């Protein structure tokens, strides 16, 4: 799916999502019963995604901070991680001395059930990365996501395909896995 065929608009009227269903019950429940409160309370800004005039997806974004442990940073520096950022030679020591890194969180991403597995989600992630790189409001080095995991569904493989890596070990008592992706990958 070419991302230029998708139309992304700020979600100004939550009622456009009234008939929206991604097929994952917990996510559908949140979209219909919790998203509006999250927007109203400044947790995130939401967007609707159209293919021609058909609503095919929605997503929400919020500013975030990525905390990496020393093992993750070592893997990045050694090139083991695919998320090694491009850094100027003079900035490497400064980068390594940080404990938190500026990020943009994909708070929610859902594709309409009949449009799943068509490349729309991946095109949206690429568009979000472009948006994060082009915005001028704040520094942003990474995308983050709490990838949803339930008994019958896991978003982790999808985000792996999109270039995300876990930044924590899977906790079976938690319904998400925190993952990250660099916005400015180093090309060796």
Task: Enumerate the predicted regions with their spans.
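Short amphipathic alpha-helix that is part of the acyltransferase structural core
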Residues: 1-37, 41, 46-48
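Conserved beta-hairpin
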Residues: 44-62
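Conserved acyl-donor/pantetheine-binding loop and adjacent beta-alpha core of acyl/acetyltransferases
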Residues: 63-108
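Conserved glycine-rich acetyl-CoA-binding loop
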Residues: 99, 112-123, 151-154
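Conserved acetyl-CoA-binding loop-helix of GNAT-fold acetyltransferases
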Residues: 117-131, 161
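Conserved GNAT acetyl-CoA-binding A-motif
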Residues: 125, 132-147
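Short glycine/proline-centered loop/turn elements that form peptide/ligand docking sites
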Residues: 125, 151-155, 169-179
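Conserved active-site alpha-helix within GNAT-family acetyltransferase domains
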Residues: 138-140, 147-169
């Amino acid at each position: 799916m070419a991302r230029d065929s998708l139309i992304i608009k700020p979600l100004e009227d939550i009622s456009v999502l009234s008939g929206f269903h991604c097929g994952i019950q917990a996510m559908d429940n949140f979209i219909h019963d919790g998203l509006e409160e999250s927007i109203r309370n400044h947790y995130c800004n939401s967007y609707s995604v159209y293919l021609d005039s058909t609503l095919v997806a929605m997503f929400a974004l919020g500013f975030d901070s990525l905390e990496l442990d020393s093992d993750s940073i070592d893997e990045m520096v050694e090139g083991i991680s695919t998320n090694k950022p491009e850094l100027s030679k003079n900035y490497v020591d400064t980068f390594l001395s940080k404990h938190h890194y500026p990020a943009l969180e994909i708070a929610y991403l859902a594709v309409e059930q009949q449009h799943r597995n068509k490349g729309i989600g991946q095109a949206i992630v690429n568009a979000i990365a472009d948006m994060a790189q082009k915005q001028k409001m704040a520094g942003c080095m990474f995308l983050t996501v709490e990838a949803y995991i339930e008994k019958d569904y896991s978003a982790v493989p999808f985000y792996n395909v999109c270039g995300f890596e876990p930044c924590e070990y899977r906790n079976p008592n938690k319904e998400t896995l925190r993952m990250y992706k660099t916005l400015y990958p180093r090309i060796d």
